[in-house]
Amino acid sequence: MLTGVLQDWVWEAGETANESCPVGSLRTASAVNSCHQGRIPLFTVGVESTKQVQEAVRFARKHNLRLVIRNTGHDLAGRSSAPDSFQIHTHHLQEIQFHADMRLDGSNTSLGPAVTVGAGVMMGNLYAQAARHGYMVLGGDCPTVGVVGGFLQGGGISDFLSLNQGFGVDNVLEYEVVTADGELVVANALQNQDLFWALRGGGGGTFGVVTRATMRVFPDVPVVISEILLEAPQAISSSWTQGLSIVLTALQSLNRDNVGGQLVIAVLPKLAVQASIKFFFLDATEATVIDRRMKPFLTKLSRANVKYTYSSKNLPHFSSNYRQVPDIHSDNDYGVLGSTVAISQQLFDSPQGPEKVATALANLPVSAGDLIFTSNLGGRVISNGELAETSMHPAWRSASQLINYVHTVEPSIEGRAKARERLTNTQMPMLYALDPNLKLSYRNVGDPNEKDFQQIYWGPNYGRLSNIKKKWDTDDLFFSKLGVGSERWDSEEQLCLLHA
């Protein structure tokens, strides 16, 4: 196992030198000679037990080592790696235990069915195990992402289940955490409540090493999935924009009936574009019934002379929809940058909302290989705001959709620098301008150059998070880029304390 390798090469190299050597690039002597350490940790410990996590944390503290926590290396800001660092890799913590009736220690209150998950478990494995027990789990659509890492500490947005079940952090019942002094503590609604609140949205690798977490599970219900596929030779055209507007209007309408959906736009060679929007009708069993429900939207596409393909299928279990095989990337060097912007329910549900979003997406400057996709919020995300005590920005409880933009980066230091500059100075301002009253981004997939991260990610909750950070990690043993308390340090390359 290559313990230091990240999901993509962008965050393996340093900020100022092209030091990375993706495996596929080692074809010439000159390429090999250019290899350096970059941001890959100097040392990694592959922990196999909670006790080993405690020993590793105490070792890092004793020797004043720069400590990073790695689950699967998917973080799009490179937080699971750092220059000159000592890494704790949680991959081997593979516990999965289901509870028919979860109760916290010292309480007789039933919290319903739940699952306890070790810090190394990936989504695909958990989905498969849950299905065998008749459950589905709120998670992401990438099967190789870790459940307990950044996903379940940074928010936990599910592209198509958050509408019905809320955020991942809304459904966490308990964390087991190794703190900066190497002690093992439990954080839940009954004990260490401040730490529990901070971990539910405050970001991974910041307050301690989460070794396992317990979260709610839900019945594995049947589903009908309908899909509309659009294609166009170029994005900037009236027919393309109109087609996007119509399918987003369908999303707007169906969301009101708690039907989740996801739009995915792929930029093809020569800037041709393809869009797929899928709708998930939970507890439905008859595809023909759903086809009749979708017919008015298809009629609108036909009348607008928008070419489309429609299909539908019924699955006896929603879990069957989850991909349970690893993502397959091309043999070329794989590197991406990405960011996100939230869209309020007030904007998206307005009569002009779908058209405004469609126009913004159609006019966003993109390159071949880029992806734009939505994550469905609203619904339970909003209603949970009255119930769930989480540290996420309160404005999430007014959000309807999340726009995700992923850009394929040229495999060079120049390509990386150009992509980051374009993302920060051109694309993100255009996306933020779509809903200027809600300047909100998802910390797990945020602009790596974000200057106002405290406000963008946490807003009025940041002060409390900062105080909890100081209480549980007085010496900032756990440093996370653009994380709580990181403003006290300079660039991650040097990591020198600016102020206490």
Swiss-Prot record:
Top-level EC class, please? oxidoreductase
Q: Which cofactor does it need?
A: FAD
Q: Which InterPro entries match?
A: BBE (IPR012951), FAD-bd_PCMH (IPR016166), FAD-bd_PCMH-like_sf (IPR036318), FAD-bd_PCMH_sub2 (IPR016169), FAD-linked_Oxidoreductase (IPR050416), Oxid_FAD_bind_N (IPR006094)
Q: Does the keyword Glycosyltransferase apply?
A: no
What is the superkingdom listed in this entry's lineage? Eukaryota
Q: In which pathway does it act?
A: Alkaloid biosynthesis; ergot alkaloid biosynthesis
Which PROSITE patterns does the entry mention? FAD_PCMH
Limits of the FAD-binding PCMH-type domain:
37-220
Q: What is its EC number?
A: 1.-.-.-
Q: Note the SUPFAM superfamilies from the entry.
A: FAD-binding/transporter-associated domain-like
Q: What is the purpose of this protein?
A: FAD-linked oxidoreductase; part of the gene cluster that mediates the biosynthesis of fungal ergot alkaloid. DmaW catalyzes the first step of ergot alkaloid biosynthesis by condensing dimethylallyl diphosphate (DMAP) and tryptophan to form 4-dimethylallyl-L-tryptophan. The second step is catalyzed by the methyltransferase easF that methylates 4-dimethylallyl-L-tryptophan in the presence of S-adenosyl-L-methionine, resulting in the formation of 4-dimethylallyl-L-abrine.
The UniProt similarity line reads:
Belongs to the oxygen-dependent FAD-linked oxidoreductase family.
Q: By what name is this protein known?
A: FAD-linked oxidoreductase easE
Q: Which organism is it from?
A: Arthroderma benhamiae (strain ATCC MYA-4681 / CBS 112371) (Trichophyton mentagrophytes)
State the encoding gene: easE
